[in-house]
């Protein structure tokens, strides 16, 4: 994912979501 794609999923930071999304998409 790109940073923008990660952010669009509602996360606080790109790094947090790069980890969280594969783990369960929180």
UniProtKB/Swiss-Prot annotation:
Keywords recorded for this protein, A-Z: Chloroplast, Manganese, Membrane, Photosynthesis, Photosystem II, Plastid, Stress response, Thylakoid
Entry function: Stabilizes the manganese cluster which is the primary site of water splitting.
Localization per record: Plastid, Chloroplast thylakoid membrane
GO terms classed as biological process: photosynthesis
Lineage: Eukaryota, Viridiplantae, Streptophyta, Embryophyta, Tracheophyta
Recorded family membership: Belongs to the PsbO family.
Region (Disordered) residue spans: 1-26
Entry protein name: Oxygen-evolving enhancer protein 1
Main localisation: plastid
Note: On the 2D-gel the determined pI of this protein (spot N146) is: 5.3, its MW is: 29 kDa.
Domain of life: Eukaryota
């Amino acid at each position: 994912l790109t940073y923008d794609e990660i952010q669009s999923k509602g996360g606080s930071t790109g790094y947090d979501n790069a980890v969280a999304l594969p783990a369960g998409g929180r």
